[in-house]
Amino acid sequence: MKLDTSGLETTMPVIGFGSNSEMLDGFSSAPSFDLPRTTDFDGFQKKAVEMVKPAKGTTTLAFIFKEGVMVAADSRASMGGYISSQSVKKIIEINPYMLGTMAGGAADCQFWHRNLGIKCRLHELANKRRISVSGASKLLANMLYSYRGMGLSVGTMIAGWDETGPGLYYVDNEGGRLKGDRFSVGSGSPYAYGVLDSGYKFDMSVEEASELARRSIYHATFRDGASGGVASVYHVGPQGWTKLSGDDVGELHYHYYPVAPITAEHVMEEAAE
């Protein structure tokens, strides 16, 4: 038995565009864009992103000691050899007990830290408890891993205090994740490590630890042209994070290397000798 479907077959009129052939002619005359002459178009895109990646510079550091975690950073933002800002906030408050640092592309770091803060808050609402530092760093690493090779520029430290005590992790834009007791990230990190490694002790007081962090940032800004501005120091303890200081590195120079007053008579006496 064959169904009669003749009543269902209708011809839809074309309104305002003429015939189908006219429509196809219009599409064929539209401008076209040639693809790059390469067999690996995805690989070409990744290389193109690397070619236009701007130079960046910063100095951030964090270390664990007996009273919690000390976090410090400078505030200079650069675009190649151009200093675009001296007041960038490179230590971001994820929640009252956790901090993140920025090194790399400012937009990438700010976006992913903001995204991490939202997810940490949702975790707290769903589970009735704060997320651990380990869990937050793993969450960020997983998110960045899913975008690896896409041109992101992120080098961050996640520092905080949870039920197990202080925690410190380094996370990069490829999804890498490292646990440690002290890290320094950025173009000024080799200079900061020189001071940090020589002066680090686990049993420091809060005042000693903050001075070590401040001095490490200062010496990095003194040698690294892409670091500068203000040296901000934060402490994360059992009661949450606290900002301890924010000193201009230009003023810190005269704090560590004071200039003795010289009179004109003294200069004349030295010249006579």
From Swiss-Prot:
Active site: T58 (nucleophile)
Enzyme's top EC category: hydrolase
GO BP term, pick one: proteolysis involved in protein catabolic process
EC number(s) on file: 3.4.25.1
Propeptide residue range(s): 1-57
Catalyzed reactions: Cleavage of peptide bonds with very broad specificity
Keyword Protein transport recorded: no
Keywords: Cytoplasm, Hydrolase, Nucleus, Protease, Proteasome, Threonine protease, Zymogen
GO-annotated molecular function: threonine-type endopeptidase activity
Coiled-coil ranges from the UniProt annotation: none
Subcellular location: Cytoplasm; Nucleus
InterPro entries tied to this protein: Ntn_hydrolases_N, Pept_T1A_subB, Proteasome_bsu_CS, Proteasome_sua/b, Proteasome_suB-type
Highest taxon of source: Eukaryota
Entry's Gene Ontology cellular component terms: cytosol; nucleus; proteasome complex; proteasome core complex, beta-subunit complex
Subunit field text: Component of the 20S core complex of the 26S proteasome. The 26S proteasome is composed of a core protease (CP), known as the 20S proteasome, capped at one or both ends by the 19S regulatory particle (RP/PA700). The 20S proteasome core is composed of 28 subunits that are arranged in four stacked rings, resulting in a barrel-shaped structure. The two end rings are each formed by seven alpha subunits, and the two central rings are each formed by seven beta subunits. The catalytic chamber with the active sites is on the inside of the barrel.
Entry similarity comment: Belongs to the peptidase T1B family.
Function, as annotated: The proteasome is a multicatalytic proteinase complex which is characterized by its ability to cleave peptides with Arg, Phe, Tyr, Leu, and Glu adjacent to the leaving group at neutral or slightly basic pH. The proteasome has an ATP-dependent proteolytic activity.
Identification of the protein by name: Proteasome subunit beta type-5-B
The species this protein was found in: Arabidopsis thaliana (Mouse-ear cress)
Gene label: PBE2
